[in-house]
Amino acid sequence: MKPDRDAAEEFFEYDAEEFLVFLTLLITEGRTPECSVKGRTEGVHCPPAQSAMPVLTKHECSDKIPQCRQARRTRSEVMLLWRNHIPIMIEVMLLPDCCYSDEGPTTDCTDLNDPAIKQDALLLERWTLQPVPRQSGDRFIEEKTLLLAVRSYVFFSQLSAWLSASHGIVPRNILYRISAADEELIWNFSQTPSEHAFPVPNVSHSVALKVRVQSLPRQPRYPVLKCSIHSGLAFLGKRALEHGEGGNQAGDNRSSLRLPRSPLFSRSLHPSPPSHSPLNTRKCPPRPESPLPPGKAVKWLYSRLNGGIDTPPSEPYSLCTNGAESPKTSRTESPIRGFKSLSITDPLVIPSPSSISGETNPLIGSLLQERQEVIARIAQRLNFCDPTAPHLPDALFTSQEPPGHKTTWNSTQDKECLKKSKDSLFSVPHPQNHNGNSLEIPERSRSSLFDTPLSPRTRTRLDRVDRESKTSPKPATCRRLVLSDQSAEGSLIADAVQDISRLIQERLQHSYSLLNGTYKLKTSQNEQVGSNHGAQTNGFVSLSSHKKPTNAPNGEESTDPHISHATKCCRSPDSSRRKPDCSPRPLKVASLKLEDHSVTKSQPLTASNHQHYVSRESWTSLKNNSSHASSPQENGLTQIGYHQPFKNRVAISEKEAEKHVRDGSTCLEKDENQEPHSSLSSTPANLTCNISSLAPTESNQTSCGNWKKQTRHSIDGTATKAFHPCTGLPLLSSPVPQRKSQTGYFDLDTSLIHCRGVPWAANRRVLKRSQDYDESQHQILSASAPPANLSLLGNFEECVLNYRLEPLGTVEGFTAEVGASGTFCPSHMTLPVDVSFYSVSDDNAPSPYMGVINLESLGKRGYRVPPSGTIQVTLFNPNKTVVKMFVVMYDLRDMPASHQTFLRQRTFSVPVKREFNGQSNKKTSLGQGRTLRYLVHLRFQSSKSGKIYLHRDIRLLFSRKSMEVDSGAAYELKSFTELPADPPFSPRC
């Protein structure tokens, strides 16, 4: 029987209290919702993942941030319970969206037994953290293992799945409650919970930590929670009306709306309006005429139809729930009870995921409202182009509730009261509509919607729809907002909605008419342009898509905004200023279709392109391939007919091209928004490459940028090439002298430059050969690189192990089993192996494989091994057959704490000479004839307490086949293990 480990020698990476705080924060902040594809993220107070890189910027807590204040409160509560040896219980619950704000319930303990929280909350998880006596024996786990297990459980929990499926939208109100585990349970699971027990690590020399969690079974869909207090809007509307008429009466009625004051902290992604109406919720100060009792907050819910976003409501149907505090408290400085704002960014308010009718999809209302807002925004932007168009009220940017939902206002008296209250609001003069009728809307609704904060997803959709509305020649259909006929302003808003539809259709039809005439210029105009500006264009005629139309008083200039660039060059600078443009954002054409579909796209005309060198060969090829020209070359101008095939209209002399490059005509100053296919490339080489039908020749120069964008996949993203293809110089270190003899490693063939598989072999610059060059004496030479036998730095072994050679490909399915033995035997680990192969010769000879075993998945420190003993690495191929078993003996007992070193074992096959005439020849020397067959590279590091770990990775070199030697030759395998000598160990970084 193995003796127990000495407790005094055991090293604990965390303090017991600190580890418990990390564990609690991982549970409470590990699923912080955010509006992203993942839908959630880890809070700033969560412990960093063990396998991740060190955090570059460490978070510093501030008392002004609610999350930091709540994290400090959580820390104090956990430490208080732990120091008194009391088990800790963490409960995770959901609350309905209708009556619980983003601040959550208060943190006092007076209303812990409030029946509302008992009925409304849905218990999801119950965690129990209990101290137990220290575990003994060799089968132990460390604190980081428990952290990894809890992080994995939190990542794959039901709550994380809901957040991921909704991209962080639902659930909105997540509550966490920390209490003593021996207290009476207040909440129970709606179904029989499933329980999971985690491994028990030792957190100190005398105490271990036992963690278990009970969770609600997996649900097929997100539950729609109903509020037990607010059953309908009629009740809420009556409460709001009573509150508007008398503050005392409203204060009495708020007793039933009061939320429990329990040690709960809540997270809410968005302010939560009632489930059937897209009402916006904002924190607003209480009204002066109705003072509130101390410690009580009010949440005002008001429609964006009658008010701006950041303006407190003044209409009676603002709904009173739990909400804001005194006006002195800003939005960012919410009380401590607002534990964590679930959204890193404050996105646009999204309606409730469910309706009174019981919608099952929580995202439908959000998508519909966002789409209607986008359409309304487009209409307002198009409205800027027409100074005679009526003003569009900002309230149109939120869709109104359908008439069918008005049935929830089941009281006739409530409706009459609401109408009376609304009539008192419309007293501010407002711009008139196109019929001359005055629209009287409250002044606060005049706030610009371009100042409204948008979520990244909404902003992306808005930009995409903006682009589509400017490019599509087909008039878009405007979604009509459903309005109530019973409201006082219903008819006025309906007229404004019709204006939206009219503006969109008129603007898009006008754009379509302009697009149709984009490239339909008359032949006479083209000839006039060519005769007047032939000296300036020098063989280049380009088209430019100008956005602003220019009209001359005499009518000579075309009103078409899409004119030839040559005409633009001769136009006076102030000609475009004769007619002011009322549009701050003119229509921009992003994609146009020409009548002639044979036009090939080329790069836009830019001034920077004229700095490139023009080779005579490429222009000679272009001139020879262009069979037809629209004008003689002696005129110095190439005219392009707009109704002829493109390949039959290009004829440019090389003299004109060189002159164009030297002079740089004024036509370089073109519109930056010009279409790529509406201009010829100013770079002759680019023009030759882009028009494949005209110039199928191949360029001799290769850009260095293309070399960086090759689609070669490295092992871990850190692989680099040995030499730069343009300079020929080594990238990582200086060249080494030429080897006079083979070293016995994976030596390279001298004709490596011919290998088609090497990524940089095809990108070498070669000397041009003359016309009478003899093919028999052909030898590819480098312009600046060292000889071919120096193409790799050192040898193949060093280049591959240090990622200096790019692999040709990877092989999936290899695995390895890593184990160790010595004073103790750690558990064997089976890990995947990233295997890649290379090409090292021109005869397609098989190259060895390189395998990388990543140990970072085992934790930051790696795989713990005894100070001395044996390490065994068994490599399996995809067929689960053993390829090689590496057995390495080591002794690192002299290694100091917080140091590192490495170990490399090589296995060679050394042939043995046969006996001739009864005489036995000696074996060949170690440097002659030996071939490297296998290699294993191990990295070791020691912790602060002197424990030895295999860390980072294990790198292997092994043969493609089992043994690549002559079957008739005598050989033997020899292994050599090497360690650094001076110094043998180095301090850890």
Swiss-Prot record:
Biased composition range(s): Basic and acidic residues: 413-423, 460-471, 656-675
Pfam families xref list: Chromosome_seg, DUF4210
One GO CC term on file: nucleus
Region of interest (Transactivation domain 2 (TAD2)), residue spans: 876-884
Low complexity: compositionally biased ranges: 254-270
Isomerase is among the record's keywords: no
Keywords assigned: Nucleus
Region (Transactivation domain 1 (TAD1)): 24-32
Subcellular localization: Nucleus
Taxonomy, superkingdom: Eukaryota
Domain remark in the UniProt entry: The protein contains 2 transactivation domains (TAD). Each of these domains may be required for transcriptional activation of a subset of target genes.
Function: Transcription regulator that syncronizes transcriptional and translational programs to promote macrophage invasion of tissues.
Similarity-based family: Belongs to the ATOS family.
Name used for this protein in its record: Atos homolog protein A
The species this protein was found in: Danio rerio (Zebrafish)
